[in-house]
Amino acid sequence: SMDLSKYEAPKEIFQFCQFKDYQVDLLVNNAGYGIKTSFHNTSIEDEENFIRVLGTSVIMLTKLFIPNMIKNGGGKIMIVSSVASFAAPSAIQPLYGPIKTFMNRFSDSININYKHKGITSTSVCPGFTVTGFHTASGVQEQMDRVPKFMVFSAERIAKEAVDATLAGKSLCVPTKTYKFLVFMLKNLPQSVLRLIGTGLAPGRYDRN
């Protein structure tokens, strides 16, 4: 395992693959967590680590592995984002949604710049998924209150994500439930999204 909050981690992962002579033609960026405490109560160091894991490490790993993909005539990149990237920024801890929105745009940029070289990037935007994410982030109790029809198994999400990535799709929103939700989020006025975000935020995370 590797701690992606450490600046050198992406380079060490790449060097390990080189040492083992691995030919990486499918890169999956799927590291993340949430911060329970309010923005003003979180240390700058914690915020920097958060940005590094969810954002900077994705950019660095993609940048490190793309040259070999070009050399080998193509490759696939999966960037695990979130439906939070389409929601009001305040719906989940202040940095989470905006970072995921940035990841979507970054994935689009990879497609624009490298699709003609046989490299495609897929931004995967799942909703609530049964993993260790919420327990590790300290919000499992809140997760348990989410309606069952909005919670899906990791296996189902992974299958749709892998299929979309191998097919070279630019965006994957797993399950019809979240496809409909994202459609609504894209078409609702920003004023309505802000109201939704304000309503969702209290009680989901530490607001002290």
Residue ranges and their predicted role:
Residues 30-35:
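Conserved NAD(P)H cofactor-binding loop of Rossmann-fold oxidoreductase domains
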Residues 62, 99:
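Active-site helix of classical SDR
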